[in-house]
């Protein structure tokens, strides 16, 4: 799980990472803890970061470029490999990834499937994190 990330990978995704850093710094200001793991900033909530828990309430964590926001570090430990697949997806698709993710959800819905569970990016993340 220790990928070699290039400067290009960081730059290609940097606009989304900057957006994620906004939430990371806000969470940190309210007591969240930050950890650098495998070239990605992981941020986990604290009792005073209830808004972060609300942001990740439906799903335990969210990836924004090279930033992963989660409810707690224990949760991040459980979902780390899944979220790191999303980081690699960002590195593949760059700033287009959020749009492609939404389009994949819409396509799943149009096919009569679930917007999250049948999203091709989530299917890939579940499969690769289980390997």
What residues fall within each predicted segment?
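Catalytic Zn2+-binding segment of zinc metalloproteases
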Residues: 84-99
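Short pre-active-site segment immediately N-terminal to the catalytic Zn-binding motif
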Residues: 55-80, 91
């Amino acid at each position: 799980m220790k990928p070699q990330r290039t400067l290009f990978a960081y730059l290609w995704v940097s606009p989304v990472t900057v957006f994620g850093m906004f939430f990371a710094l806000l969470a940190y200001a309210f007591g969240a803890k930050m950890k650098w793991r495998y070239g990605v900033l992981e941020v986990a909530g604290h009792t005073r970061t209830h808004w972060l828990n609300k942001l990740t309430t439906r799903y335990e964590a969210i990836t924004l470029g090279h930033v992963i926001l989660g409810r707690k570090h224990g949760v991040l430990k459980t979902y780390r490999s899944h979220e790191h697949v999303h980081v690699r997806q960002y590195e593949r698709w760059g700033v287009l990834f959020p749009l492609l993710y939404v389009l994949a959800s819409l396509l799943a819905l149009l096919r009569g499937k679930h917007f999250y569970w049948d999203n091709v990016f989530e299917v890939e993340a579940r499969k690769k994190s289980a390997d």
